[in-house]
């Protein structure tokens, strides 16, 4: 079993403590040191996951006093996101934060930002290509390893004949999650692409389960896919009878863990993905410092044994 819990969670607590200490040293962040930072993500307006990321961005803005703007394509359109990055470059900010779900579409604008002398930090997706595109660091979780840990856990719980539902098939990070999950299960990848619509996903899950009644393990790569999967399993009377793992947290996933429908969630702590890059770019603008390495915000397992610890923060800071 891949151990992705204790040590890394402890390191994340240390990271937050160190940042808090830097921000509370008593040194004033005056006007001369005020950084202009633009955050551009691919998260759609309807995806609750990105609301938590934005909460992290806003918290960092408040803590540092930096001028921070958050931008995203309302529907998650990646070509529109590329245009948003290009528009950000034209403003000549002191730093840009980006997610990189599709390097083939977003790589050009990111390289252009770097060529213009703008420090870029990638977050959430793009860990594998971040350095090659010129980003100074990445804040996120190693997606394949996270999926691998999930697959090993599902297999250990007796799951077999697995399926991975992917609501963002263009996102390489989510493909990595599914591949890791399959490898952890010791099975061939069975990835089913779905839309981001709740009812469509629910109906797809029901149809798949009806056509493949021997399915014993499901992975949903985010709340967008997990929430309707929970509803589908309950409607079919299969809640608690199929091993269900989900990436990320939200109210429905937390409730699902408590009632036994969801066996575990893989938490990447997206609040940190919004918070840390802003703080790092602000401090880089102020005194020229950068961390020596990228920062893993996750992964870690949330199960019935520890869910109460994170319940109050789900959908807000986790």
Language-model-detected regions and their locations in the chain:
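Bacterial N-terminal signal peptides
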Residues: 17-26
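Flexible loop/hinge segments that line or gate small-molecule binding clefts
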Residues: 103-145, 159, 248-263, 309-313
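Hinge/cleft segment of the Venus flytrap/periplasmic-binding protein
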Residues: 33, 184-188, 272-318
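Hydrophobic alpha-helical
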Residues: 86, 94-114, 181, 190, ...
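Short beta-strand elements in bilobed, periplasmic/extracellular small-molecule ligand-binding domains
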Residues: 62-75, 161-164, 181-199
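Hydrophobic alpha-helical segments within soluble ligand-binding/sensing domains
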Residues: 81, 137-162, 201-202, 249-253, ...
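Short, solvent-exposed amphipathic alpha-helices that sit
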Residues: 48-64, 146-150, 172-189, 204, ...
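Extracytoplasmic "Venus flytrap"
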Residues: 36-64, 69-85, 91, 99-103, ...
